């Protein structure tokens, strides 16, 4: 007789109520499926798509996430008074508390592990170790980083430690004029040596500096960042000379610190050391000889400023020809020290620009930025180079990843590269739900990683990739109006909520294959906690609806009154 008569055995019109339940479950399941679809579509990417042993991680920096800015024995950095000056930071934000990782580092490391990442790249606050930049050691600060490093390792993750991420101790700026003085070379090297001696038994991956070009250019050419020096700045400065002096002293500081590491620690500690450089890809606006030359000048003045001396022992020819006597020179001894002073290079890659030739105007003030003799162009024939993210400088151009990595491979004899930062930001004015469902960020990572894979397949020696950033945090001049994290932070409660992009990484990285490491997966409870934070209803329905439907039918037979409320 078939199954239709079964309806007659459901008491009190229960069939209609059961139908309501079934429809509700289907609707919820489809909603969850739509959410999961974005998370689960890895675009063909997996661990197996990358070389065996390839490392995936996320990155942060001390000033941006730690908090405890005036506590725990930490001395001020050059950024501390700057962020407390009204009008300097969007929304007048500051980093006094930020994400409070100082107290919540275990929670963040656990979260990182639950998302199937392999490594955590973070920086040490120089003034938390040496409040005055030199001299007396702050034992509380030393203990904090010991605890952080130990916990990262305990959780099966790899620490990648950066010694300086913009936050020069304020005392050194006042005493020596910061990076303008050659005296700081020895001071930084002493700090670095202390860190090698204290943490190097566990830390096997070091970086000396993060984006020294930013320190030189924004701190001493435009003057927008601390110490806010430029030709027309109230603090004084010379945009034609100081950026080059600062970069020169940072390069010597890096090389001297590396020399100490190699001579005193590397053999016994068996670690490696490098430097992090930013590199926007520069594409000529047209095929003209002039625009192609402009694009090459931009590459030389941007990343070549550091890669050329660190690999070849001298500055790029374009810089020597244009800057002339304003460009410092290395002595033979310094050139020998600098050349080859990196085991790998961290590359922060975000965006790309078109470059057009622009002869220097006769009356233009001489500066580092004017020395490029280029125009930055963001569209060609009315078509933008890419979709703009929240930041006005960040155009989403995935092919720029391939261009940057392949360029370094071809020009610099294929050095070992770590993609040390890559990401995009959202506006800080969204709702929590809008933050969590960050499909644009998923597409960003999918497309940029696809281009990175192409570069690796074409022979680029890239060994690791770090997303910027684990957490929404204090984004320098943008304060809290710019959100780069794959994890949303409620800055009222400081509670963390993994975004869809975090779950996308979790799904992509849990795939087994030649690139995976043993034990890299997560337990069911870890996966569940990470997923449900973003979309609890969808994830719960997706995993249990096949069990719920038969259960509900049985309940209708046994306890018809249980569902009576559904008919109201």
From Swiss-Prot:
The active site is at 211 (proton donor), 421 (nucleophile). Glycans are attached at residues 287, 429. It comes from the Eukaryota. It holds the Pfam family Glyco_hydro_1. One of its GO terms (molecular function) is beta-glucosidase activity. One of its GO terms (biological process) is carbohydrate metabolic process. Belongs to the glycosyl hydrolase 1 family. PANTHER family: BETA-GLUCOSIDASE 8, GLYCOSYL HYDROLASE. This is Beta-glucosidase 8. It comes from Oryza sativa subsp. japonica. The lineage of its organism: Eukaryota, Viridiplantae, Streptophyta, Embryophyta, Tracheophyta.
